[in-house]
C-alpha cells in the first residue's frame, strides 16, 4: 500500500502579508494619521505638499497683553459669503472693566509724552502697517467681501490716515492754543489737554479704515482708548492690535474687546471711569440711549450723522479732520499776573 501524499501549502498563502496587529488601546485612526504626517514631511518643500493648517486664535487686547475673555466664551465669525473664518472672544462686562482699568493706568504715561514723541509713535504704527499690507488686504477681502483693488485702497487709506494724524500730534496745541486778550494786568492762556479715557465703538461695516479714522484722533492728543470692535467683522481690528503691540504705543493706551455689542456698549457708556464716548459707530437711536447712560458722569459723546452711517464715505476728506481731535480734548485756561 502506497503512502498518502502530503498536501503542499499554496504559494499565494505563504507570501500573503499579514495585517498589522493593532492594540486594543491604540485608536484606529492612529496609523493613517501618522502616515499622512510622514507623507507631508517627506514632501516638504514640494508643490502640493499636504500639511495641517494652523488656525489663528483671535483674543482680546488689554493692557498690552492678549488675554482670553474671563468667561471663556467665543462666537463664530463668518466671511462675506457666509463661510466660517474663525472664532473670536465673546467679551463680557468684566473684560470692559479690566480694559478701562488698564486705560486709566496708561493714560498719564501717554499724556505726559511730548507731541513730537506721540507723532513718532503714530508714524511707527503706519510703518508696521505698511509691512503687513498684504495680510490686511486679504483679511479685508474676506471680511468685507470686496475685491483686491478695493481692499488695497482701503488699507492704503488706513496707513495714510495714521501718517496724517501723526503730523498733527505736535501741531494741534499750537493751532488751538492761544493767548487770550483780557482787560487787566494778566496773561490769559488757553491750552488743549486730553480728556482721559475714551470709549470708542468701532463702525460695524468699515472694519479697518473706519476704526482707524475714529481711533487715531483720540490718541493724537494723549487720550487712552477702550475699543469695542465690529461685531460681525472683528478680525482686522484684532490684527491691528498685533501691530500696536509691536509698536512703541505703551501697553494699555489702546485696549480692544470683541463680542456682541448688546452685551458691551451699555457697560462702556455707563462706566464711571470713562471720560468720553465715541458713539459714531452706532445708529442714531442707539447713540441716544448711550447718551442717557453717559449722563451719570457727564461724559462727552460724539454722535453719528443724523442719517446714520449707511452711505458714509470713509475715503472722503471729511473722514479725517483736526476738528475730530478737538472732540476729545478739554481746554484749560490759566491766569498769570503781569510782572513789573
Whereabouts are the PLM-identified features?
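A charged, well-structured terminal subsegment
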Residues: 258-280
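N-terminal Rossmann-like NAD(P)+-binding subdomain of aldehyde/semialdehyde dehydrogenases
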Residues: 3, 16-186
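Short acidic active-site motifs
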Residues: 150, 186, 263-264, 286
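C-terminal segments
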Residues: 3-10, 16-41, 49, 160-175, ...
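Short loop/edge segments at beta-strand edges and connector loops
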Residues: 251, 258, 305
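Conserved small-residue-rich beta-alpha loop and adjacent elements
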Residues: 80, 167-250
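Short catalytic-loop micro-motif centered on adjacent basic/acidic residues
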Residues: 226-229, 252-256, 276-279
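Hydrophobic/aromatic ligand-binding patch that stacks against planar heteroaromatic rings
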Residues: 216-219, 267, 293
Amino acid at each position: 500500500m502506497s503512502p498518502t501524499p502530503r498536501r503542499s501549502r499554496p504559494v499565494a498563502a505563504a507570501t500573503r502579508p499579514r495585517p498589522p496587529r493593532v492594540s486594543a488601546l491604540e485608536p484606529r485612526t492612529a496609523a493613517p494619521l501618522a502616515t499622512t504626517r510622514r507623507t507631508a514631511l517627506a514632501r516638504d518643500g514640494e508643490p502640493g505638499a499636504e500639511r495641517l493648517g494652523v488656525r489663528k486664535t483671535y483674543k482680546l487686547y488689554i493692557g498690552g497683553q492678549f488675554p482670553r475673555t474671563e468667561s471663556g466664551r467665543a462666537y463664530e465669525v463668518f466671511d462675506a459669503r457666509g463661510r466660517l473664518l474663525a472664532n473670536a472672544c465673546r467679551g463680557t462686562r468684566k473684560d470692559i472693566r479690566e480694559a478701562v482699568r488698564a486705560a486709566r493706568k496708561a493714560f498719564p504715561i501717554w499724556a505726559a509724552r511730548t507731541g513730537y514723541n506721540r507723532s513718532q509713535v503714530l508714524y511707527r504704527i503706519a510703518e508696521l502697517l505698511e509691512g503687513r499690507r498684504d495680510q490686511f488686504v486679504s483679511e479685508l477681502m474676506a471680511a468685507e467681501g470686496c475685491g483686491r483693488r478695493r481692499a488695497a485702497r482701503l488699507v492704503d487709506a488706513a496707513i495714510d490716515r495714521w501718517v496724517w494724524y501723526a503730523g498733527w500730534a505736535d501741531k494741534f496745541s499750537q493751532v488751538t492754543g492761544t493767548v487770550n486778550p483780557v482787560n487787566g494786568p494778566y496773561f490769559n492762556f488757553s491750552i488743549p489737554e486730553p480728556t482721559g479715557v475714551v470709549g470708542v465703538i468701532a463702525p460695524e461695516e468699515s472694519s479697518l479704515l473706519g476704526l482707524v479714522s475714529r481711533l487715531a484722533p483720540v490718541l493724537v492728543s494723549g487720550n487712552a482708548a477702550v475699543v469695542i470692535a465690529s461685531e460681525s467683522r472683528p478680525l482686522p481690528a484684532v490684527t491691528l492690535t498685533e501691530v500696536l503691540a509691536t509698536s512703541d504705543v505703551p501697553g494699555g493706551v489702546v485696549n480692544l474687546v470683541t463680542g456682541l455689542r448688546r452685551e458691551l456698549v451699555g457697560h462702556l457708556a455707563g462706566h464711571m471711569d470713562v471720560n468720553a464716548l465715541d458713539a459714531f459707530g452706532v445708529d442714531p437711536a442707539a447713540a441716544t440711549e448711550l447718551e442717557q447712560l453717559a449722563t451719570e458722569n457727564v461724559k462727552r459723546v460724539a454722535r453719528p450723522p443724523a442719517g446714520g452711517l449707511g452711505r458714509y464715505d470713509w475715503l472722503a476728506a471729511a473722514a479725517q479732520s483736526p476738528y475730530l481731535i478737538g472732540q476729545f480734548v478739554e481746554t484749560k485756561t490759566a491766569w498769570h499776573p503781569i510782572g513789573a
